[in-house]
Amino acid sequence: MTESAPSAFFTTSTPADHVHEEESSNTGYFENLPENDIHSFFEIDATSEWIKQGNHQRIALQFPDSLLPYSEKVTKLIESRFRSESAKKTFVLADTSYRSCCVDEVAAAHADCTALVHFGEACHSAPTDKIDVKYVLGSMPIFIDQFRMEFQNVADQLTAEHIVLLMDSCFSHEQEKVAAVIKEVLPGNRHVECSLLPSEDVLKQNRQNIYLGREIPSCLRNNQPTDLIFCGFPNSPLLPIWLLSYPSCSTVSHFNPINKTIQHESTRSSRLLRKRLFLVEKLKDADTVGLVVGSVGVDKHREAVKRMREMCKKAGKKIYVISVGKINVPKLSNFSTDIDVFVLLSCPFGVVLDSSDYFRPVVSYFEAEIALNPAKTWAADFGWSAEFAAFLEDKIETEVPDDKAAGDFSLISGKVRVQKTEEEKNGDGPSSVAIYNPGYCNDRTWKGLNDGVSTAEDSTKMGEGRSGIAQGYSGK
């Protein structure tokens, strides 16, 4: 067991906050896989059979950065199973449009693929029905002996009656062995539950009691005090999202398969949830909302955009829909003078848990639902969710007080938020269109990203550019 300052797995940042560092700390763990392990890790036989059964002719193979070095070998192994079928073609997808945990159906569509094999960690968001998808999560050893040795050092600190075991996808095949060790080591008769990964067929047919692609243990559904045992990478997006969603997990013991140590600490979910409630108040105070589309491969994202437009309209707020691919601070800073609060529409692993580096607050779809839909209430406790599809069918109510000047009290500014009248809403409201001319940014002191070449004398007038081809433009 190791002791440290607030451990990395309690960070308020997810890979969405550091897109360039998304898998850097995990990459070395997957290096130098033996030849036999490549076949089993990438499920070559099962994948080939899936392609055969579906009679797919154009197949996209999507790899995260950590597994990209194996893409050529995996592609050749799969193609070798179909040498007699010249019509079958495979395409390697990397550097995905949004996040590597999501199905990149946009890139697959560019290659006119009818099937996609997703390798590596996945958020398990329900994909759209435009393409057939197979998930290959990989299988890595969890080092049972080292886990037993480390867990014996922290077992006495687990005091809750209920114990939940949660694992990153690539270790989930070891779940039963790890659960057996936990039951063996824990003193007394404790109730140990595993958050299992259901089969793909189950996920397609019924997602009830499923969260982040995993079955929700009964103790968490009933909000009972629970100790969490997590086996996964230090920068796993799964753990911080899970702890916010289930604050009844009072402590967490994190087994790191890289250095084979366990860290045990109390969670800070309640404090972090109160920060999310602060963001709800910021959105209530906002006049202009920017809906940032952070994924188009998740089912019902179009319905989510439509619902957000409707909620903003009823709340009397302007809304702009923005798509910038992978989000970062410089990209959103370009819109910070026009937008008061950004709402990020993304998969669960893409939720920004710490927006302190951004010029404007970045909230999740759940917080937007609480802020803009009077039918919803939330007190920074149980019920926070990173999955926007969970409440798309809920009713949107409109608060219309008898006195149109009446409003509610802002907990941030200390002022009363006045309910806008129908005339005010219809005058220059959410449905209005802002027209930007080429000189739109001229009067601003800050104009966004600067390449270091532009000058104050740069003209916004259109002129004739160069002609020709790259080999020799005119005027060279």
Swiss-Prot record:
Binding-site list for [4Fe-4S] cluster: 102, 123, 347
InterPro entries from the UniProt entry: DHP2, DPH1/DPH2, DPH1/DPH2_1, DPH1/DPH2_3
Key words, A-Z: Iron, Iron-sulfur, Metal-binding
Cofactor note: Binds 1 [4Fe-4S] cluster per subunit. The cluster facilitates the reduction of the catalytic iron-sulfur cluster in the dph-1 subunit.
GO CC term, one of those recorded: 2-(3-amino-3-carboxypropyl)histidine synthase complex
GO molecular function: 2-(3-amino-3-carboxypropyl)histidine synthase activity; 4 iron, 4 sulfur cluster binding; metal ion binding
Region (Disordered), start-end ranges: 1-24, 451-476
GO BP, sorted A to Z: protein histidyl modification to diphthamide
Family listed: Belongs to the DPH1/DPH2 family. DPH2 subfamily.
UniProt subunit comment: Component of the 2-(3-amino-3-carboxypropyl)histidine synthase complex composed of dph-1, dph-2, dph-3 and a NADH-dependent reductase.
Protein known as: 2-(3-amino-3-carboxypropyl)histidine synthase subunit 2
Native source species: Caenorhabditis elegans
Gene: dph-2
